[in-house]
């Protein structure tokens, strides 16, 4: 099973401030949807709650695993797709393997990305040409461990960005 992170980050690796993304790039959201639709996504509880606050519902079309330290936690809403609680990364990976998943998409936040880094196979990143203030950051990437393949540079509302794929070196 491949473990794939999907992330939008600034040049300073910022991914968020106060549980929100510090930019709004519609093309990035469409790219995220294209990468994750129909696949199981793994996220932390704070990311799940941030999605609920923003969308008013869980992400549609994607079974969701929420990683939390709280054995009592349960989602307050029920989506069309299953929402599963995992108490550890190992627990989440075991559930994913038991379901026969080919890929598990890791969608944040910062603590979850940090926990998964050593096991990630691929990182699908949107690299944004800004260094916003933040309180959540994606871990640093060692070029000795990752092969970087950038796509074409684009702009949205005057903000430059590039979709980049990182694959772990063999």
Which residue ranges define each predicted feature?
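Enzymes that bind and transform nitrogen-containing heteroaromatic metabolites
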Residues: 1-170
């Amino acid at each position: 099973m491949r473990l794939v992170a999907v992330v939008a980050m600034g040049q300073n690796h910022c991914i968020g401030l106060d549980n929100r993304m510090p930019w709004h790039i519609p093309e990035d959201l469409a790219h995220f949807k294209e990468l994750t639709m129909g696949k199981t996504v793994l996220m932390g509880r704070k990311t799940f709650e941030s999605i609920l606050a923003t969308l008013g519902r869980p992400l549609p079309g994607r079974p969701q695993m929420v990683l939390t330290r709280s054995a009592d936690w349960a989602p307050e809403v029920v989506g069309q797709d299953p929402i599963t609680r995992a108490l550890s990364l190992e627990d989440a990976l075991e559930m994913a393997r038991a379901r026969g998943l080919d890929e598990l998409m890791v969608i944040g936040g910062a603590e979850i990305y940090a926990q998964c880094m050593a096991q990630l196979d691929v990182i699908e990143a949107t690299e944004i040409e800004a260094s916003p203030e933040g309180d959540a950051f994606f871990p640093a990437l060692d070029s000795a461990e990752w092969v970087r393949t950038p796509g074409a540079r684009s702009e949205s509302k005057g903000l430059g960005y590039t979709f980049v794929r990182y694959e772990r070196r063999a």
